[in-house]
């Protein structure tokens, strides 16, 4: 009833006006938004895949271990021989171990990563990128100080994580752990 009254009183109303496309409107998704969404989805997927690999590697190591109690001296060996590390140690000879001591910090940090490290890094970085994109596409716009700050946080996150992982690696090396 109300609908028919609106039809009678509104002379500008035409049939199917709600479904006809407005050709002058701007598309909702630009290429930048598409690439940002693709990057965020990829980072989230990487994080979930690494969580799955972490779970599988730890479950396999628990099945292979003896159920003996762990002594305090064994803790360093467990960290050193962690089954969830991405790059497994493959050094056998003394010369290769000497070459390992001469490698850069970046190489050592990458070889000390576990699946959980990569998972946490990728999920948090994806969240920061998604948040930055959301702020840029909102009413605040890309010229706002909040958007510029979020872009700085997105770009500054990987170096910050590298420094934190490097500090962790140095502390573990002081405790006697060698990263091969």
Swiss-Prot record:
Membrane topology: Multi-pass membrane protein
Annotated transmembrane regions: 34-54, 121-141, 145-165
Domain of life: Eukaryota
Any one Gene Ontology cellular component term annotated for this protein: mitochondrial membrane
Subcellular location as annotated: Mitochondrion membrane
Transferase found in the keyword field: no
Induction: By cell wall perturbation.
Alphabetic keyword roster: Membrane, Mitochondrion, Transmembrane, Transmembrane helix
Record's protein name: Mitochondrial membrane protein FMP33
Lineage: Eukaryota, Fungi, Dikarya, Ascomycota, Saccharomycotina
Gene name of this polypeptide: FMP33
């Amino acid at each position: 009833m109300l609908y028919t009254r609106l039809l009678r009183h509104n002379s500008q109303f035409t049939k199917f006006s709600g479904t006809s496309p407005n050709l002058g409107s701007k598309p909702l998704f630009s290429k930048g938004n598409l690439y940002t969404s693709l990057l965020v989805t990829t980072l989230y997927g990487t994080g979930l895949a690494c969580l799955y690999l972490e779970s599988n590697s730890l479950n396999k190591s628990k099945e292979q271990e003896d159920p003996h109690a762990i002594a305090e001296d064994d803790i360093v060996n467990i960290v050193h021989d962690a089954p969830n590390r991405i790059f497994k140690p493959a050094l056998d000879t003394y010369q290769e171990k000497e070459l390992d001591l001469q490698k850069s910090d970046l190489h050592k940090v990458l070889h000390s990563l576990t699946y959980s490290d990569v998972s946490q890094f990728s999920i948090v970085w994806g969240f920061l990128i998604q948040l930055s994109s959301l702020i840029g596409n909102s009413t605040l716009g890309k010229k706002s100080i909040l958007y510029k700050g979020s872009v700085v946080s997105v770009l500054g996150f990987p170096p910050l994580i590298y420094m934190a992982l490097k500090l962790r690696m140095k502390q573990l090396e002081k405790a006697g752990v060698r990263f091969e």
